[in-house]
Swiss-Prot record:
SUPFAM superfamilies, per the entry: Single hybrid motif
Record's function text: The glycine cleavage system catalyzes the degradation of glycine. The H protein shuttles the methylamine group of glycine from the P protein to the T protein.
Pfam families in UniProt: GCV_H (PF01597)
N6-lipoyllysine PTM positions: 64
Species: Paraburkholderia phymatum (strain DSM 17167 / CIP 108236 / LMG 21445 / STM815)
Gene3D superfamilies: 2.40.50.100
Name of the protein: Glycine cleavage system H protein
Gene Ontology CC annotations of this record: cytosol; glycine cleavage complex
InterPro entries per UniProt: 2-oxoA_DH_lipoyl-BS, Biotin_lipoyl, GCV_H, GCV_H/Fam206, GCV_H_sub, Single_hybrid_motif
Gene this protein is translated from: gcvH
C-alpha cells in the first residue's frame, strides 16, 4: 500500500498536500479507496463555503458504501476536481493523482491534527 512521504494525513483517511500558494489539495488515501472498492460517485457539497476542521464537505460512493469526506482544516472550499466528478473510478487507480477538492485555510488554521506518513502508516497497521 502506498503512503507518500511528502503528504500529510488525517485519521479519516484523507491526504493533504500544501501548495506553493498556501492552499491545501485534499484526496483520499490508497487505504481508503481500497476499503471503499469501486468508486462510482463523488460530489463536493460545500463548494464556496467556509467550513471548520472536521466538517463534512463531500461524499464519495462506491458499490459497497458511501463515505463522507472531511475538511482537514478550517477554511474555504475553493475548488472541486471536475475530472473526479466525471470519472470517479480514477481515484481507485491513482488516489494520489486524483485529488478531490482544494481548501484555502483560514488565517491561523491549525494543521496540528495532520499526521506524517509514518504516523498514518502506524494508524492503519502498516
Amino acid at each position: 500500500m502506498s503512503i507518500p512521504a511528502d503528504l500529510k494525513y488525517t485519521e479519516s483517511h484523507e491526504w493533504v498536500r500544501t501548495e506553493a500558494d498556501g492552499t491545501l489539495t485534499v484526496g483520499i488515501t490508497d487505504h481508503a479507496q481500497e476499503a471503499l472498492g469501486d468508486i462510482v460517485f463523488f460530489e463536493v457539497q460545500q463548494l464556496g463555503q467556509t467550513v471548520s476542521a472536521g466538517d463534512t464537505v463531500a461524499v464519495i460512493e462506491s458499490v459497497k458504501a458511501a463515505s463522507d469526506i472531511y475538511a482537514p482544516v478550517s477554511g474555504e472550499i475553493i475548488e472541486a476536481n471536475p475530472n473526479v466528478a466525471d470519472t470517479p473510478d480514477a481515484v481507485n487507480s491513482a488516489p494520489y493523482d486524483n485529488w478531490l477538492f482544494k481548501i484555502k485555510p483560514a488565517d491561523g488554521a491549525s494543521q496540528d491534527r495532520l499526521m506524517d506518513a509514518a504516523a498514518y502508516g502506524k494508524s492503519i497497521g502498516e
